[in-house]
Amino acid sequence: MRHRLSGRQLGRNSSHRKAMFRNMSASLVEHELIKTTLPKAKELRRVIEPLITLAKVDSVANRRLANARLQSKSAVGKLFSELGKRYATRPGGYVRILKCGFRAGDKAPMAYVELVDRPARAVETAVEVDAE
């Protein structure tokens, strides 16, 4: 019976699913924007939001918990040094999921997963400086 079971299996066994979300979480922390299928994006939100909440309090114990879930030193470092401070006053909702059409090969619904309040890329603009 299927009582009170939450989460999607995504056609993978548990270890594959765990490794996939570990890799996707580390990529999202490092790049702040990734493209994936819509069901994976919705499940990734359940993984990454508690990690960002954990990063609001920078302690050795919290860093060890985050490292156990991400297993990427650079991602854990960025999580606590940048993202924890960026979202210190936000009470949740750190991830935005934007639908972006369907994949060409199998028509799977695709989505962008991005961190909200991420800094926009610096666009090179020609600014004239008045020389006096």
UniProtKB/Swiss-Prot annotation:
Keywords: Ribonucleoprotein, Ribosomal protein. One of its GO terms (molecular function) is structural constituent of ribosome. One of its GO terms (cellular component) is cytosolic large ribosomal subunit. The keyword Ribosomal protein applies. Gene3D superfamilies: Ribosomal protein L17 (3.90.1030.10). The keyword Aminoacyl-tRNA synthetase does not apply. InterPro entries: Ribosomal_bL17, Ribosomal_bL17_CS, Ribosomal_bL17_sf. One of its GO terms (biological process) is translation. Part of the 50S ribosomal subunit. Contacts protein L32. Belongs to the bacterial ribosomal protein bL17 family. This is Large ribosomal subunit protein bL17. It comes from Cellvibrio japonicus (strain Ueda107) (Pseudomonas fluorescens subsp. cellulosa).
